[in-house]
């Protein structure tokens, strides 16, 4: 569960290294987000000569959270860090690679491109 002003790692090669969540695009009264939710982020740290620059405001999909999630079969899955993948306005990925494991629940939300690029799906 991530809230506004939470800082996350970026799990793709778009050029950003760390972002801060500034808005949840769920339309929900609950302000927290979970895996598969779309959020508005601002880039806090970026590599030089990357696709994105520091200070840019972009959309992102949450792919890993430290809090984890409970599956229907009763198992609980947690990750070591909070991570997002940057997307464009039309929903396509900004980067061409995805680093680290991602949750299987992204398939249910329709992010098949992230699933196919990820090295491991848990």
Swiss-Prot record:
SUPFAM superfamilies: Ribosomal protein L14. Keywords: Ribonucleoprotein, Ribosomal protein, RNA-binding, rRNA-binding. SMART domains: Ribosomal_L14. Coiled coil: none annotated. The keyword Ribonucleoprotein applies. One of its GO terms (cellular component) is cytosolic large ribosomal subunit. Disulfide bonds: none annotated. InterPro entries: Ribosomal_uL14, Ribosomal_uL14_bac-type, Ribosomal_uL14_CS, Ribosomal_uL14_sf. GO terms for biological process: translation. One of its GO terms (molecular function) is structural constituent of ribosome. The keyword DNA-binding does not apply. It holds the Pfam family Ribosomal_L14. Belongs to the universal ribosomal protein uL14 family. Part of the 50S ribosomal subunit. Forms a cluster with proteins L3 and L19. In the 70S ribosome, L14 and L19 interact and together make contacts with the 16S rRNA in bridges B5 and B8. HAMAP family: Ribosomal_uL14 (MF_01367). Binds to 23S rRNA. Forms part of two intersubunit bridges in the 70S ribosome. This is Large ribosomal subunit protein uL14. It comes from Metamycoplasma arthritidis (strain 158L3-1) (Mycoplasma arthritidis). The gene is rplN.
């Amino acid at each position: 569960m991530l809230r506004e002003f939470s800082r996350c790692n970026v799990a793709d090669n778009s050029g950003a290294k760390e972002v801060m969540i500034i808005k949840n695009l769920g339309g929900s009264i609950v302000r927290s987000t979970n895996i598969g939710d779309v959020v508005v982020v601002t880039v806090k740290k970026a590599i030089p000569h990357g696709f994105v620059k520091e200070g840019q405001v972009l959309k992102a999909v949450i792919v890993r959270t430290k809090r984890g999630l409970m599956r229907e079969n009763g198992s609980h899955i947690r990750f070591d860090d909070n991570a997002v993948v940057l997307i464009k306005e039309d929903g396509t990925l900004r980067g061409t690679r995805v680093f680290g494991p991602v949750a299987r629940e992204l398939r249910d939300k329709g992010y098949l491109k992230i699933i196919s690029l990820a090295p491991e799906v848990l």
